[in-house]
Amino acid sequence: MISGILASPGIAFGKALLLKEDEIVIDRKKISADKVDQEVERFLSGRAKASAQLEAIKTKAGETFGEEKEAIFEGHIMLLEDEELEQEIIALIKDKHMTADAAAHEVIEGQATALEELDDEYLKERAADVRDIGKRLLRNILGLAIIDLSAIQEEVILVAADLTPSETAQLNLQKVLGFITDAGGRTSHTSIMARSLELPAIVGTGSVTAQVKNGDYLILDAVNNQVYVNPTNDVIEQLRAVQEQVATEKAELAKLKDLPAITLDGHQVEVCANIGTVRDVEGAERNGAEGVGLYRTEFLFMDRDALPTEEEQFAAYKAVAEACGSQAVIVRTMDIGGDKELPYMNFPKEENPFLGWRAVRIAMDRKEILRDQVRAILRASAFGKLRIMFPMIISVEEVRALRKEIEIYKQELRDEGKAFDESIEIGVMVETPAAATIARHLAKEVDFFSIGTNDLTQYTLAVDRGNDMISHLYQPMSPSVLNLIKQVIDASHAEGKWTGMCGELAGDERATLLLLGMGLDEFSMSAISIPRIKKIIRNTNFEDAKVLAEQALAQPTTDELMTLVNKFIEEKTIC
């Protein structure tokens, strides 16, 4: 059996189609001066062909996925035709006498590598998008064939080293039953698109292309993260039964989509989605999100050569506000720094950037950045129910300073005659132990909290979650972290405020009952997790969850705490 990263759930049975393209061989020899213009023309001609292909793919993506996914390829075209990218490639051809393919490869690979070095998984996996564009450009420069996946004529399970977003957009969905790749991650655009299509997929297997041949009979079990190659009839029968069970469960979960997250004894909470762009709103709605608990705005600042203007930001926030209608959207101001550096901002070299110049620290030092973003959010609030949230807060002084700035920007907009929501709510992320321990004081200054468990866990336990040597110590359900979370929830309630959670823990099924019992008011997560979390909440009693939370928080170790939680789940047969 083969396993990897479960990208999109489901089970598929079918023959393997192994995708192999001609190898791209880069010509690295130096060219003579009289060949420079010829190589520049090769680059420009190859780019024109690649752009035309992407335009066709964009149109097909719009027809298949809707406008949200069409925008992915609009972004690909913009990057391919980026003036700075063009100048860098032409400069290498002219100044270093590189061939068109060598120059294009060096520039594209440099951008992809820079993204891969980030700690944020979503941003790291944008490297695959950049390489997708680069591969298409190189194949056109070199005159190599490009596989047309829309021409597949029989039912198959695709097996490939990797599938790019542009390849995924071309799939013949009547014939492609699922796919398996050597590379890739759960938050890559390819995985996101597979989930949009509800197409079973396992990525990141490492070596599936070396273990599978064309025509092999496969079972792609993207429920239990297993790939079976030429299985026995007994295994096929067993997995057919699992497939029926999955279909039944999926139908049951779908019935919960538009139902409230309310317990058997009448306690109601909100279940919302985390999004990065307006493209994600459609998936949130399809899975029954009751709003957006985290809109990550930093993606507006990435893959550019300058800060986005107020007008550019206003257009993006307005699009999300209008797409969400009457549902609330919590807009987090840019969380740049740490693992998310911007090349155009000249970040200082820091020994520990996660504890350095980042998030609101940048915003308060560079007031023009704060001004443009907050004004844009305020203006967009006239078109929907937006809330503003500031990350990486450690003190009351910071919150007061930020609120003072907001009042200045509100007055500017009044003077300019520009509409905004005068009563827009202001909140902060609680993701540092400093904020958690003064939560009672912070609650007097803001309208709501949202707990960021990823960083809160990392800072509380002094564990770098990206360090494989100590990653086992990264335990969001440790008693120390959970007791801090309880302290934050209680502090907000004491001041008549509410607390949400937008970290990974909010979508962790093992933690749902515990967080519910601790009094969490809002759960925000990846959209695909919403139906299952709603099911858990609707199948339990709030009073039982409170008893569980009280007992669990009294446990001295993570193991003892988890034993208690698992026993409760088994006895109540909730999940």
Curated annotation (Swiss-Prot):
Top-level taxon: Bacteria
Keyword Kinase on entry: yes
Record's keyword annotation contains Plastid: no
Molecular function terms from GO: kinase activity; metal ion binding; phosphoenolpyruvate-protein phosphotransferase activity
Catalytic activity: L-histidyl-[protein] + phosphoenolpyruvate = N(pros)-phospho-L-histidyl-[protein] + pyruvate
Positions bound to Mg(2+): E431, D455
Localization: Cytoplasm
GO terms classed as biological process: N-acetylglucosamine transport; phosphoenolpyruvate-dependent sugar phosphotransferase system
Keywords tagged on the record: Cytoplasm, Kinase, Magnesium, Metal-binding, Phosphotransferase system, Sugar transport, Transferase, Transport
SUPFAM superfamilies assigned: Enzyme I of the PEP:sugar phosphotransferase system HPr-binding (sub)domain, Phosphoenolpyruvate/pyruvate domain, Phosphohistidine domain
Alphabetical list of Pfam families matching this protein: PEP-utilisers_N, PEP-utilizers, PEP-utilizers_C
Positions that bind phosphoenolpyruvate: R296, R332, N454, D455, R465
UniProt signal peptide: none
Gene Ontology terms: cellular component: cytoplasm
Functional note: General (non sugar-specific) component of the phosphoenolpyruvate-dependent sugar phosphotransferase system (sugar PTS). This major carbohydrate active-transport system catalyzes the phosphorylation of incoming sugar substrates concomitantly with their translocation across the cell membrane. Enzyme I transfers the phosphoryl group from phosphoenolpyruvate (PEP) to the phosphoryl carrier protein (HPr).
Free-text note on domains in this protein's UniProt record: The N-terminal domain contains the HPr binding site, the central domain the pyrophosphate/phosphate carrier histidine, and the C-terminal domain the pyruvate binding site.
Protein family according to the UniProt entry: Belongs to the PEP-utilizing enzyme family.
Quaternary context: Homodimer.
Protein name as annotated: Phosphoenolpyruvate-protein phosphotransferase
Primary gene name: ptsI
